[in-house]
UniProtKB/Swiss-Prot annotation:
Pathway, per record: Amino-acid biosynthesis; L-leucine biosynthesis; L-leucine from 3-methyl-2-oxobutanoate: step 2/4
Superkingdom, natural source: Bacteria
Binding site for [4Fe-4S] cluster: 338, 398, 401
The protein's name in its UniProt record: 3-isopropylmalate dehydratase large subunit
InterPro entries: 3-IsopropMal_deHydase_lsu (IPR004430), Acnase/IPM_dHydase_lsu_aba_1/3 (IPR015931), Acoase/IPM_deHydtase_lsu_aba (IPR001030), Aconitase_4Fe-4S_BS (IPR018136), Aconitase_4Fe-4S_dom (IPR036008), IPM_dehydratase_rel_enz (IPR050067), IPMI_cat (IPR033941)
Cofactor(s) named in the record: [4Fe-4S] cluster
Gene name in the database record: leuC
Taxonomic lineage of the native organism: Bacteria, Bacillati, Bacillota, Bacilli, Lactobacillales
Pfam families xref list: Aconitase (PF00330)
Organism for this UniProt entry: Streptococcus gordonii (strain Challis / ATCC 35105 / BCRC 15272 / CH1 / DL1 / V288)
Length: 460
């Protein structure tokens, strides 16, 4: 009998009823919520006279609509209504939350792990497509819609069809200047944004094992851009060390770890598809188009037009085949988002700007992903490094990742961004987004354009 993958083992633990191949009722261990996808779900409960079944397994935070200059100066009527409504709802339904402006507040996919609520073995959902981030801990984690949010509120369960399994093996040692963001951007550039559709993607290989937990979260975060709503990794000692000592960590930690050690893929586990990538052959990545698969290694020319999507992307981005990333005149730099706003991301970016100054006529902002990250970064002096270099140092929030708050890229301006999506108008109407690592974004802020960070002393 064939072995089982970590996903198989976790799925079996959480099935309540139903046959494989058909929708199965799954038990939810942890439900994260934020202000945008929860209001209608709460109203549905009120209309039906229901309560939240397990408020103790639900946790809320404020992130999408939060201003990052003055977090209380919410001028957009809809944004203010959503934030006020979540404040009211978590109080009325007895849900633990990181209050707006509190010492825990931040992006939901950062706050969850930081509180220790994200753990190996859990089945986690949230009304946000980047919930796969939590899969880096050895958890099943995926985004759900608002009607499903209401269903989880009422029942602590969700109906799901078990997906196929894909194994992506990253092997080798990455060259200097290549980071986990480049791993996932390279995967998407090679195989496309639909390659993972219908699959859970397990990321494995020695290159993954050598990554920190924060670097692993970056990869799982962008599973949805690969077409899969779930990404997962085997937990190991790094995982246990990350969780230990946090407020939400299991009280009997040794017993928990003993259990978690059984939740790894068997050597003979079977997958529906296997992809292998040698990271020693990778280079820093930059996207040129309007979806994450439209990316190239630094130094490579942008491809010829292959279809109408390419033509539209080139027209929107005001670029053309044959040009290179270094030819782009950048106007904005954004270092932040649930992909790359963790402490290690900020430390990495700071290395490239220390003692320097951003290029003229360029706006650069750094948005720590959570209040705890901001607090520690400031103790380390990172805020001063960035501000001395001409960056704006902001309060936590989703910020410029998406145009749902005051942080927007102006029409027609090219932005080097550490976020996860480069769709048309994603960062503001007419904004032209180029996805890259924190190192590439920081170095670009100094030069005013993308540069080959492999040649810089900061990576030597």
């Amino acid at each position: 009998m064939a072995g089982k993958s970590i996903f198989d083992k976790l799925w079996e633990r959480h099935v309540i009823t139903g046959q494989e191949g058909q929708p199965q009722l799954m038990y939810v261990d942890q439900h994260y919520i934020h202000e945008v996808t929860s209001p209608q779900a709460f109203q549905g409960l009120r209309d039906a006279g229901r309560k939240v079944r397990r408020p103790d397994l639900t946790f809320g935070t404020f992130d999408h609509n939060v201003p990052t200059v003055n977090i209380y100066d919410i001028r957009d009527v809809i944004s203010k209504a959503q934030i006020d409504k979540l404040s009211e709802n978590v109080k009325d339904f007895g849900i633990e939350h990181a209050a707006h402006g509190s010492e825990l507040q931040g992006i939901v996919h950062m706050v969850g792990p930081e509180t220790g609520k994200t753990q190996p073995g859990k089945f986690i959902v949230c009304g946000d497509s980047h919930t796969a981030t939590h899969g880096a801990f050895g958890a099943i984690a995926f985004g759900i819609g608002t009607s499903e949010v209401e269903h989880v509120f009422a029942t602590q369960t969700i109906w799901q069809v078990k997906p196929k399994k894909m194994l992506v093996k990253f092997t080798g040692v990455p060259p200097k200047g290549v980071y986990s963001k480049d791993f996932i951007l390279a995967l998407i550039a090679r195989y496309g944004v639909a390659a993972g559709v219908g699959h859970v993607v397990e990321y494995a290989g020695d290159a993954i094992e050598h990554l920190t937990m924060e670097e692993r979260m970056t990869i799982c975060n962008m599973s949805i851009e690969f077409g899969s709503k779930m990404g997962i990794m085997n937990p190991d000692q790094k995982t246990y060390d990350y969780v230990q000592g946090r407020p939400g960590a299991p009280k009997d930690f040794e017993a928990a770890v003993a259990d978690w050690k059984t939740l790894v893929s068997d050597p003979d586990a079977v997958y529906d598809k296997v992809i292998e990538i040698d990271v020693s052959q990778l280079a820093p990545m930059v996207t040129w188009g309007t979806n994450p698969s439209m990316g190239v290694e630094f130094g490579a020319a942008f491809p010829e037009i292959r279809d109408m999507n390419d033509e539209r992307a080139y027209n929107y981005m005001d670029l053309s085949p044959g040009k290179k990333a270094e030819d782009i005149d950048l106007g904005y730099i954004f270092i932040g988002s649930c992909t790359n706003a963790r402490l290690s991301d900020l430390q990495l970016a700071a290395k490239f700007v220390a003692g320097k100054h951003i290029a003229p006529n360029l706006t650069a902002i750094v948005v720590p992903g959570s209040r705890p990250v901001k607090r520690v970064a400031e103790k380390m002096g990172l805020d001063k490094i960035f501000m001395d270099a001409g960056f704006e140092w902001r309060d936590p929030g989703c910020s410029m990742c998406l145009g749902m708050n005051p942080d927007k890229v102006p029409d027609g301006v090219h932005c080097a961004s550490t976020s996860n999506r480069n769709f048309e108008d994603r960062q503001g109407f007419g904004a032209k987004t180029h996805l890259c690592s924190p190192a590439m974004a920081a170095a670009a802020a100094i030069a005013g354009r993308f540069v080959d960070i492999r040649q810089l002393p900061e990576v030597q």
